[in-house]
Amino acid sequence: MAVKLIYLFLFLYIALLISGRTMSTTAGRRDGKSGRTEWLYVAGECAKLPRCNKYCVSNGFHLGGFCEKLSPQASYLSCVCKYT
């Protein structure tokens, strides 16, 4: 029984790591070889968060945030917070 629980928690941990709400980009020079990884967190729709940057900073994302369309087919802008 304990082994099954360990596998369940491992599966949930991996699922959280590869969830669709986080994306990774490389920050730095144009060729992307600075070595620093910048993570993006989708906080919600910008219509619901009109001060996206202030929202991100006040919630611990010290690099701030911005509004962006996540795909060409998206009909709304999403608030994206940055962190390392």
Curated annotation (Swiss-Prot):
Q: Which InterPro entries match?
A: Scorpion_toxin-like_sf
The subcellular localization recorded is: Secreted
Annotated Gene Ontology cellular components are: extracellular region
Its main subcellular localisation, reduced to a broad class, is secreted
For this UniProt record, give its keywords in alphabetical order, as a comma-separated list.
Answer: Antimicrobial, Disulfide bond, Fungicide, Plant defense, Secreted, Signal
From which residue to which does the signal peptide run? 1-24
**Quick one: a GO biological-process term for this protein?**
defense response to fungus
**Disulphide linkage map:** 46-67, 52-79, 56-81
Classification via Gene3D superfamilies: Knottin, scorpion toxin-like
Q: Does the keyword Transit peptide apply?
A: no
Which family does the record assign? Answer: Belongs to the DEFL family.
Q: What is this protein called?
A: Defensin-like protein 37
Tell me what organism the protein belongs to. Answer: Arabidopsis thaliana
